Amino acid sequence: MKKLLVLLLVPFFAFSQTNPNREYWQTNKWTPKNGMNAEFESAVAKKTQKFNNTKETSFATYQLITGPDQGKYMRVMGNRTAADFDADDSKELDYWMKNVMPFVESNDGNIRWWRMKGFSQNWDNDLPPARFVKMTTYTVKRGMMSDFLRFWRNNTELQKELGYTGITGLFMLTSGGESLQLLEVEPYNSHAEGTGKMSDPEVNYIEEYNKMHGWRTHRNDERAATAAIEELWGVTIETAELKPEMSSKL
């Protein structure tokens, strides 16, 4: 608990490397004390209603429903500028310490990301949080990021051309975790409907990829992108479900 308190007393929005033109996001996973989920949920809901009731201060809360972190609560602070992290949040942090921390067992620490807009598609920050999010984390080998992103960029370009309806955001870690880490976020509202589809479900995707980017480029780009990912821990996939009462209502 002592280490946890030290972590929380660090300025909530402080980080060293920023770009004024980037769009920043922050995530943190929280574990309530045993048997205190209801108290934790209620305390977070009250804090969110009090301090996070505008678009500029909003938070979304999701609960992990798959993976080793199943059951943890993930707080998401999104669509911020670098300047937003200079705001004085001492009152908000003090409230959290007094009213939420008594029900907290641990947290994983803040992780900050910036959204790579050119590698995202159909992303709209004005949309309400989706009921579900599928999150795929990629850890890329040093010196091989360009190989990974080339395949991603080409796929994004083709999917836009083919009328893909799904929403995808690609985020790069800027502080709080493994370097060279990327997070793919796919919001959706129904398992039955899935994350998206092409306008023509019968399209030969590989053939269209090669038409757009060159003969055999799909095979070569896919191999290069796969080789760029760390072998043992390079890909993790999680799914989370929105907790509306613990999220901002805008």
Q: For the regions a protein language model found, what residue spans apply to each?
A:
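Bacterial Sec-dependent N-terminal signal peptides
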Residues: M1-N21
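Short S/T/G/P-rich N-terminal loop/turn motif that feeds into the first structured element of a domain
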Residues: S16-L250
